Amino acid sequence: MTIRRRDILLGSGAGLTALAVTETGTAESGCASFSAHRSTYVLVHGTWHGGWVWQEVADRLRAAGHRVYTPTCTGCGERFHLTGPEVGLDTHITDIMQVLECEDLDNVILVGHSFSGTTITGVADRLRERIQRIVFFDALVPREGRMSGIARDPDTGDFPKWWKEREKQFIDGYQMDLWQDYPMEMLVPDTFPEVAAKLRRLITPHPAKQWTDELVLADGGWQGLNPTYIHCVGQAYRKSSDLMVGPARGPDWKFIELDIPRDGMLTHPTLVATTLNALSNVR
C-alpha cells in the first residue's frame, strides 16, 4: 500500500487537520488537530545526528498526548564524548534496547532514520514483544544480502573500493566526517538556511562501525511488526535509492511518500508529526 502526502492530510478518518507546508526557505510552524489515541514513540536518529534532530517532531507528538523518546546513541550528538573505535552497531542497538527496557515501554512505534534502519531492526529482533510498529524513515531496510550499511562483495567479503578510499579520511581512523564527503544538500536544500545553520552547529562525526558491522538476526527482525516505510521523495541530491528501500514496496508493507528532503523532520516537522500520528490509528 502506497500513501501519499495528500492522503495523510485528508486524514482518512484519523481526525487530522490539513496544514499548509511552507517551502520558502524556513521550517514550517503551527500545530495540528490530532486524534486522541495515545501511543508511545521511540524516534532514533541517523548518521551524524543525535536525538536533537527529532525534537520539533517530538514536541508536536507530545502536544497531542503521546509519549515520545528521542535517545542519542553512543558516540553521537551530546554523547559524542563517549565515542571510541569499539562503538558500533551492537552498541547502538543496546542503547535503544536500554531505553525500552529501563522505561518499561510496550506497544512502541519504533522509528529509525537513514542508516539507523539496521539499529531499529536489531532492536525489534531482540525485543519484538515490545514493538507495535517499526517505521523506516528514508532508512536502510536490512534483508538477506544487505545486513549492514556498507554492502560487501558477496564472493570475497571485501568492502568496495570507494569505501576503502573514504576510510583513509576517517577522524582518528574510525569516525566518519559528513563534511569530508558530502555537501549540506545531502541533508537539506539551500532553500532552508536556518535549518542548514542548525545542522552546521550540531552535526558530529559518526562511528564507522555502526555502518560496517553485520546485523545478525535471530527472530525475524522487522517481519510481522507492521513494517512501514516513509520515503522522502523531495530529496534532490543523492535521493535514497531502491538499495535502501529494498523490500519495503512489498504487499506486507505500508509505504508512504512525502515530498520533503532527507532531514524532513527539521524542514517539515508538522507534516512528519502528522504522518507519524496517523500511524497510531492503524492497527
What label would you give each PLM region?
Residues D7-S29:
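N-terminal export signals
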Residues T22-V42:
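C-terminal segment of N-terminal export signals and the immediately downstream linker at the start
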Residues C73-V108, D125-R126, A151-D153, D158:
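Active-site loop/oxyanion-hole signature of alpha/beta-hydrolase fold enzymes
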Residues I109-E144:
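Conserved hydrolase catalytic core segment
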Residues F136-F170:
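Flexible "cap/lid" loop of the alpha/beta hydrolase fold
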Residues I256-R283:
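Catalytic active-site module of serine/aspartate enzymes centered on a nucleophile-bearing elbow/loop
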